[in-house]
A protein has these predicted regions:
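ER/secretory pathway lumenal C-terminal domains and tails of membrane proteins involved
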Residues: 1-299, 306-378, 390-883
Length: 883
């Protein structure tokens, strides 16, 4: 009875879906639509009514459990793309907004021109055509200017697609993307990791600092990636910094040519395996910029194939020496060759051991333990990604730890097989409360729930606006047609047309003024397709009930059973008077899907007799927590649903604080061996250190507000002991906040130590990034901006803490100490760059960035002394003017 049975392959259909990996979707490989089809006005063919054209690509079947056979439920459909955007080698195909922006930024923005048909419609009056032309040309010129200065985005084209003719990427652009990014960055880079060397294990998005291949030979690496000896410690002192000096690569090349020369049949076999499992896999998968994680594992078979040539390279060296020595090689030399070559795998073993040693890596275990150990009995926990799901399931499976907790991965709830699994008991965890039956969420049923509250209000407001009468809308519409015209605002309106429109929308008039439903009422409305109002809504909006459903309100009311909430420990008795009678759920989307259907069904049955938690990994999107963001209590790694309102983000905090409970939880945290220097951690593990620090700083802040200064100090000392201030854990807002809290507690020495190490690392980063030539600095532009921003945050933290104590003089002193080196560096850079006239593009890029950095810092100075800030601004301005 496992937590998840992927695709439920107990049936033939489930097995087929499992093998076809249907959860990953499909994409074109040799011929199909480019990504511009999703932004151009002619990208997808349309029907006369304006809907997108689709074509049948197959049939959807399900297993009918009553009939005990497979039955057809719907057709599989795909868009019919415009012929201008269908092409050979559509390697740039994704319609993901972020991916499309990356396509354009990296491999060329799509060409576009003004669509004159937009303003040349002869059926429009001349004045309308002139007005349209003026608007179109103005927008077009603005887009051209944006393209010229490099600030244009794909979203700009999408907003103005009606005005433009957008051209797809050229074949040259598609091939460039395939060769440079897919084969080069996502293929050759991984190959070289294994046979040349690896810079570090930070996930790379084409930056020169993260996850590149290296050789260990400075003259080669520095030319490609900048001076590696000056790389910031975060990247340089990484346990995955492995240098093989290209020795495995060279051995493999020797073996490649030896086999080609001696046994071409076997050579072809290995070459075929190598190409199919490298180039073939990359061609088929069409990886996108950028993937959620490194995809080197997809090419592992090709590495095995090349390793065969590495082994044959030893034989090649023997044969080469034998040839050079004219077959006079002796036994000792013959033995020495493999012994010497054995040094290559030994070198790799020594280089790889520290980052492959998992003996002290307890990040996943600690994360799972910390999530589960602090939850109340019989809890429901919603999680969102692989990293906050599988470790938890793993701990429940292997140790039966907290197997009373029902863990639900929210992002998988769109799949019927997954909904079915969360609606059953798992080990000692009860199923989610819900009356949903399989027929309610099966394939092609309730795939899309349209929230039409705004549309309904718009329809009735529209017809209301043409009524000019003291009578109500329904009273006017009940009159004979010849009398209706007397109550219309414009005599030109056709009373029969108005009446016909009203009669069409009249069945759902009750929802015009009805803003909300209880979740129980909403669930019943969704489940009842015989409801006349819903049938009228479906007819009006032109969608058949079945795969599409409708919700006529955008506010749901969740009643609170206060007695149960206290009885089951969701709220403590001392907080009983703060509980609300009901929770209002404000739905901000106009389309809901199966995950939201499940949530509605669950809350329709919810009696506040089980605690509900949400993982911290999902709360950034209110929809992920069903818009319950104002009713959360911070629990550290999770947030608990409580019927006490705490506005989301109040005082810069997410969720209500419960310091007493949090302090108890904090004492029992697992720390994953982060404090051990010889422990190796993955990129994901290291990123979670910020979560621990944020939890500690939030708790310490709450304790300080309660006057519990000693406890706050203990919390801060504990987190700094267990997650030391080391480059591998990097700087984050949590660390900045800890230094501020130390200052607040009077622990000046500890605060200054943190600030000094933070400053040193940020300056190290900024200096390295600015030392790179422009073409390399471009790859780390966001990291440079982030380092400067972190520096500003560090300064702001120091200044704001002192200003809270009304110590303006010390705040000014601290600011000047941080600002003056930045200012001096800018002056030196600017004077050097302009010594012989105008700065070149490389220097201009650095100068522009430094000016923005200084402006950001002077914004902080303005908090302390506006006169000082103005004086510094004027000094910088005069420097620019006089040169």
């Amino acid at each position: 009875n496992p937590h998840m049975n992927l695709n439920d392959p107990d049936t033939a259909l489930g097995m087929l879906d499992y093998f076809n990996r249907v959860q990953y979707g499909d994409w074109p490989t040799v011929y199909g639509a480019a990504y511009t089809a999703h932004i151009a006005d002619d990208g997808i063919e349309t029907e006369p009514n304006g809907n997108y054209k689709t074509k049948i690509t197959g049939k959807n079947y399900i297993k009918d459990r009553q009939l005990k056979k497979y039955v057809w439920v719907s057709d599989k459909r795909a868009y019919e793309y415009g012929k201008n955007h269908v092409q050979f080698m559509p390697k740039m195909f994704s319609n993901d907004p972020n991916v499309m922006e990356n396509y354009a930024a990296m491999y060329g923005f799509p060409e576009f021109e003004l669509n004159t048909a937009f303003f040349n419609n002869l059926s429009d009056p001349p004045e309308i055509r002139a007005q349209k032309r003026q608007i179109a040309e103005q927008q077009y010129n603005e887009l051209l200017q944006k393209k010229h200065d490099g600030s244009i985005k794909i979203s700009d084209l999408q907003r103005n697609s009606e005005l433009l003719i957008i051209h797809p990427p050229t074949l040259a652009q598609q091939l460039n993307y395939f060769i440079d990014f897919q084969l080069g960055y996502m293929g050759f880079r991984y190959f070289m990791w294994n046979f040349s060397g690896r810079q570090n294990d930070w996930e790379g998005n084409m930056e020169v600092t993260r996850g590149n291949w290296i050789t260990g030979i400075p003259i080669i690496d520095n030319a490609r990636l900048g001076d590696q000896s000056k790389l910031p410690a975060k990247f340089k002192d990484n346990k995955a910094n492995n240098k093989y000096y290209m020795l495995p690569l060279i051995l493999g090349l020797i073996g490649f040519f030896v086999q080609l020369n001696r046994n071409v049949v076997h050579w072809w076999a290995i070459l075929s395996l190598f190409l199919l499992t490298s180039v073939g896999v990359l061609f088929y998968t069409s990886v996108k910029p950028f993937e959620p994680r490194e995809r080197d594992y997809a090419l592992v078979s090709s590495f095995y194939a090349y390793a065969i040539w590495v082994g044959l390279g030893v034989q090649g060296i023997y044969l080469l020496l034998k040839y050079l020595l004219k077959n006079k090689i002796n036994t000792k030399a013959a033995i020495a060759i493999p012994v010497i070559c054995l040094g290559v795998p030994i070198l790799m073993g020594f280089q790889n051991w520290d980052d492959h040693d998992r003996s002290k890596r307890r990040g996943a275990y600690a994360l799972a333990y910390n999530y589960l150990s602090n939850l109340d009995q019989n809890a429901i926990l919603f999680v969102y990604g692989d990293n906050d799901t599988y470790p938890l399931w793993g701990l429940q499976e292997t140790e039966l730890f907290r197997d009373d907790v029902k863990i639900v991965n929210y992002t998988l709830l769109g799949a019927p097989w997954n909904i079915e699994q969360v609606l059953r008991k798992t080990y000692n965890a009860e199923a989610l409360p819900s009356k949903l039956e399989y027929k309610d969420y099966q394939l092609s049923t309730n795939d899309n729930i349209m929230v039409v509250a705004r549309n309904i209000r718009s329809r009735f407001s529209e017809i209301q606006s043409i009524i000019s009468s003291e009578l109500s809308l329904s009273e006017v519409m009940s009159l004979p047609p010849n009398e209706i015209s007397q109550h219309l605002a414009d005599p030109g309106y056709d009373p029969m047309g108005v009446l016909e429109f009203y009669n069409e929308i009249k069945p759902f008039e009750e929802f015009y003024n009805k803003e909300s439903m209880t979740v129980q009422e909403a669930y019943e409305f969704l489940m009842n397709n015989d409801n006349p109002a819903k049938q009228a809504i479906a007819r009006h909006f032109g969608y058949p009930l079945g795969s599409v459903n409708f919700l006529p309100v955008d506010k749901l009311i969740l009643p609170v059973n206060k007695e149960n909430a206290i009885k089951h420990g969701i709220v403590s008795a001392k907080d009983a008077d703060q509980m609300e009678d009901y929770i209002t759920i404000n739905i901000s989307r106009q389309q809901l899907y199966k995950p939201e259907l499940l949530m509605i069904s669950m809350f329709a049955e919810y009696e506040w007799d089980r605690p509900i938690y949400f993982s911290g990994g999902g709360i950034s999107d209110p929809g992920n927590i069903f818009w319950l963001n104002d009713y959360l209590e911070n629990n550290g790694f999770t947030y608990k649903l409580i019927p006490i309102k705490t506005p989301f983000g109040k005082d810069g905090k997410l969720g209500r604080s419960n310091p007493e409970k949090m302090y108890e939880n904090f004492q029992n945290l697992e720390w994953a061996n982060y404090h051990k220097d010889n422990a190796s951690f993955s990129n994901t593990d290291r990123n979670y250190t910020n979560t621990y620090r944020n939890i500690a700083s939030r708790l310490a802040q709450d304790l300080i507000e309660l006057g519990e200064h000693q406890k706050a100090k203990e919390v801060l000392d504990k987190v700094m002991e267990m997650i030391p201030d080391q480059p591998r854990y990097d700087y984050g807002l949590g660390l900045d906040r800890i230094s501020q809290l130390y200052q607040t507690l009077g622990e000046t020495e500890k605060a200054e130590k943190l600030i000094n190490s933070t400053r040193d690392r940020l300056v190290e980063k900024i200096n390295f990034y600015e030392s790179l030539p422009l073409h390399l600095r471009y790859t780390v532009a966001s990291e440079l901006a982030s380092a400067r921003s972190d520096y500003s945050i560090m300064v702001y933290g120091q200044v704001s803490t002192l200003l809270e104590k009304s110590d303006t003089a010390e705040a000014m002193k601290v600011f000047a100490a941080e600002f003056d080196p930045v200012k001096q560096k800018f002056i030196e850079t600017y004077q050097t760059a302009t010594m012989n006239g105008e700065p070149d593009s490389n220097d201009k890029n650095i100068i522009d960035g430094q000016i923005n950095f200084i402006s950001e810092l002077l914004g902080i100075a303005d908090m302390i002394d506006t006169v000082y800030a103005e004086k510094q601004t004027e000094e910088i301005y005069n420097l620019l003017i006089n040169n």
